[in-house]
Amino acid sequence: MSARYDGMIPEEERLKETAREYVEKHLPQTEERIGIPMDPACVLSLVIPAYGEREHVFRLLASLAEQRGTSPEEFEAIVVVNNPTHAPTRLENEPETVYRSRCEHFLRARQDNQETLSILAHITTGAASSDLSDDEREAIDLLKEHGVKVHIVDKASDGKTLPEEVANVGGARNRGTAEAIERFLEIDRNGIVAHTDADTRLDPDYLRNLIDAYTRRPDAIGVTGEVIMEHDKDALDDELFRLKHLQGLYKKLILAYHHALFHQRSRPHESFEMQAKTVGPSMSARAYQTALADGIPTVGKGEDTRFGERLSSCGKVIFEPSAVVYPLLRVSSRAEGGSGIGVIKLREKNKEGGQLITVENPVLADVFERRITDLTTALQHVFETQGWTPEGVGVIFEHLLTIDGRKVYNEEKLQHFVSRLVKNDPQEVLASFDRFWVVKAVRRMTRPPLHQAIPDLLEKTKSMPLLMENEYTRTLIDSLEREAGKPGDT
């Protein structure tokens, strides 16, 4: 009996249809396509957004040409050169220095993008130019020598930019993603759509290890790799770089701590596996499942994390430690958020002589997890009896955040959080409150200095068998303990 005989459609066919619908929605026929068809042997398409990145993108492309264990027929790169039509508007609570930096980047990027488009054209046309730097010429020669396919999507020139509301990093990623999925549909393969950033260097075995991860784990619909920041000494001195590196390790570990607490409370009899967090420099998913998650959110910051949340709701996303990338930790205002903006803020704090880095309080995390059930019930009662008001919701949070008679919250931050919370649909909030909103609340409350929080987090995580028995989290614990023990003032 055929699969269609009894009215059942095979899963693969359903996914294909979803992929076609996604492409139709996000890549209208009026959009100019890549002129070269996808190689029938291609299994991975790498999407790279580039907004004013001439200085860095050829570092990435050179590393792409130096990949080991893969043939050039197995992969391609799609570089989405993009910029908005108009200068950015100032965001709510955005520091003046950050906004000014984003405006300056916009002005530089428009010219920079045209230069990048011209240089990238040399890869396919073979034309020589005296305007190339030595590094650019070397990268182009490597790409040609190894037969690497680099395709260009021009969303920077007049009349070609993305619509203003999606002319951002998420919009650029999604534009490249839609074309990559369409190309895989044309060769009838549910290939891999991978993402990285234009300032990132790929480990020589990155693509091979990423592809192998999907082969070993057919149950995985997404894979994220290891991200190791490289030091741009023009941006940060050694001590500030060390602080940012410690902060990155801390964020990864406290996220794992939240996962473990949640697992202990809700799934104590199941095996513990960290759900990998997707990050822009190293995230990937199967093409049709990417479409199932509706692609990359078209937002100016946090598109990678939001994509991961969407993808995780569709299936398993795993961490592959051997798929390593090296982004530059540098000053950058190309996106509305991210590490580049964080560097700008850190340098400003350093000039002012204030507390450099504060972080989420690990002491509060387990307190919150223990109170989630009571909190959800209380909020439901408030909604049913008083309505969804800042006053009613605020009282619940004030109770939650008072521990042993001591308030552990910042009054202004709490009011701001609650006012934003009640603007959302209450039923959706209550449905997701089990963990998501509590974590958001924790991050908005009193934040200790990094050097005070690290010992507390290490003590708590090292006492949890779930984390110590997991290879990924144990490596994080060891790394944070080792790096925090090095000389320096955190």
Regions found by a protein language model. Give the residues of each.
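Terminal low-complexity segments of carbohydrate-biosynthetic enzymes
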Residues: 1-11, 351-490
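N-proximal low-complexity "stem/linker" segments adjacent to membrane-targeting elements
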Residues: 1-73, 80, 490
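Active-site-proximal specificity loops/subdomain of glycosyltransferases
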Residues: 23, 90-190
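Short, acidic, metal-binding catalytic loop of nucleotide-sugar glycosyltransferases
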Residues: 39, 62-74, 83-86, 112, ...
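Acidic donor-binding/catalytic loop of UDP-sugar-dependent glycosyltransferases
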Residues: 187-190, 196-213
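Short beta-strand-to-loop element that shapes/binds the nucleotide-sugar donor at the catalytic cleft/hinge
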Residues: 209, 221-242
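A recurrent flexible, glycine/aromatic-enriched loop bordering the glycosyltransferase active site
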Residues: 259-284
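Acidic donor-binding loop at a coil-to-helix junction in glycosyltransferase catalytic cores
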Residues: 301-307
